[in-house]
Amino acid sequence: DKTMTVPSVTGTRQQQLEQWLQDVFANQKFILDSLPGDASARQYHRIQLLDNDAVETGRYIVMDSADEQDALQQFINVAKLMAPAINVPTLVAQDMAKGFLVLQDFGTVEFAHLLVDAPAAQVNDYYQLALRTLVALQAVPVATAKTDHQLPDYDTALLNREMDLFSEWFIPYIGIELAQTLWENLKSALIAEILAQPQVIVHRDYHSRNLMQDQADHTRLGVIDFQDAVIGAYSYDLVSLVRDAYVEWPEDQVSSWIQDCWQLQKQAELATADNAAQFENDVNVMG
């Protein structure tokens, strides 16, 4: 009465997940495949529902967050915050005590996949869609994010902590010694500029692997992996998108997209820089 493949779920946890999914989907047959994980303790699976002839009738994403109930709640909070503005996965079922969620599945086509061998005009169309999606997220009121959804600030402590990853990991990797006083002064100067920028909702991982082509509607990008969202500088997510660690573009193309984003912010009547040059400077300060 079911078919399962769960390579990375073992023992009692597998039984719990299997039983819960049987309850959620009324004992339908299903196949469960584990997906590559991220750096967290969360595990992700794709569930395919089957009819009696083994024909697929639906598919969803299953999140297993056994030891991260707080993270699970934060995921739900952020999803509810973002859902009216952008295309995030619909929550289908949840069990907070067990640490399980079932979510809408956008499919397997990442933004990065769309760019491969695409002509320049098509690439630009994709980036315009990603920019419009980003500005729609930035239009969500910060007050709503703080009061109704408990989003934290991207504050000095967090910025310091993340910048120190650069000095702790990258600098030793390239074999350079960095004078501590120089580094602390540089961090302080950068943080002061970053905190002075207009504050918006920041996804924190807005890049080509966390944007999906929604298989139900190719005109919309599905946005995933948003649970670490914060309130922070309006340049952060744009840097993640146009200076993506996974995709590289000529600097004149990057500059063009930065200016496009500024225009979109102005059209949406968001707080932004007075001119395109200042906006690009803010983006360059960020990364």
Regions from the PLM with identified roles:
Residues 17, 23, 142-152, 157-158, ...:
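An alpha-helical support segment within catalytic cores of ATP-dependent transferases
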Residues 41-48, 137, 189-236, 248-249:
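Active-site acidic catalytic loop and adjacent metal/ATP-binding pocket
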Residues 164-173, 234-272:
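Active-site activation/catalytic loop segments of kinase-like enzymes and analogous catalytic loops
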